[in-house]
């Protein structure tokens, strides 16, 4: 359900899967620097670990130019030191890995700002308090699950995911899985906070 508050709109979503039951409370507050998004994940019952927590935004495929400040390659909390933090400009296709079988890929850690542009308008995501993790794909996660081969990849938009965290990937294919320090226990609530705003691209 949703309700209007003194500081903006609050939306509460109840989620349930085979592991447990959760609530996500989202608050959207207008500020001079954009809309302040605050999302709180709370475990009601069941599962005590969560693989990731974030918000996904869909934009038209025309938003293909990416800019971000963060780790300059695919990185996760247990695999990131090889990529320094720097400003990156690329296309959406460069944000996913060209695996023979399409799979989850392209996460960027330690991001403080990200933007996607169609050449006229830019949508900016800015970290508040802590850096976020960033994923940008040309299709949804649900669409990705159905893909078996590279030729199955079909662009349906630009999907920007801003995350508080994503668990590590470990080396489960040829060694140990994710180490305990790179898993996220639901012993307490998790909060994700960032700003989002829309800007006109400067005339050229």
Language-model regions, residue ranges each:
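Beta-strand/loop-rich accessory regions of lumenal/periplasmic or secreted enzymes
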Residues: 1-204
């Amino acid at each position: 359900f949703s309700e209007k508050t003194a500081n903006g709109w609050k939306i509460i979503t109840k989620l349930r899967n085979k592991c447990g039951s959760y609530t996500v409370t989202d608050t959207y507050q207008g500020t001079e620097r954009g809309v302040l998004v605050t999302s709180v994940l709370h475990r009601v019952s069941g599962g005590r670990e969560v693989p990731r927590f974030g918000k996904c935004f869909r934009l038209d495929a025309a938003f293909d130019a990416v800019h971000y400040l963060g780790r300059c390659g695919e990185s996760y909390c247990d695999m990131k030191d090889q990529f320094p933090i720097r400003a990156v400009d690329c296309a959406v296709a460069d944000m996913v890995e060209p695996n023979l079988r399409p799979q989850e890929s392209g996460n960027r850690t330690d991001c403080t700002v990200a933007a996607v542009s169609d050449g006229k308008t830019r949508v900016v995501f800015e970290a508040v308090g802590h850096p976020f993790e960033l994923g940008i794909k040309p299709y949804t996660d649900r669409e990705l699950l159905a893909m078996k081969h590279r030729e199955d990849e079909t662009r349906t938009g630009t999907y920007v995911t801003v995350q508080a965290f994503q668990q590590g990937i470990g080396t489960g294919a040829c060694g140990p899985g994710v180490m305990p320090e790179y898993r996220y226990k639901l012993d307490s609530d998790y909060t994700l906070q960032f700003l989002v705003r829309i800007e006109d691209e400067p005339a050229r």
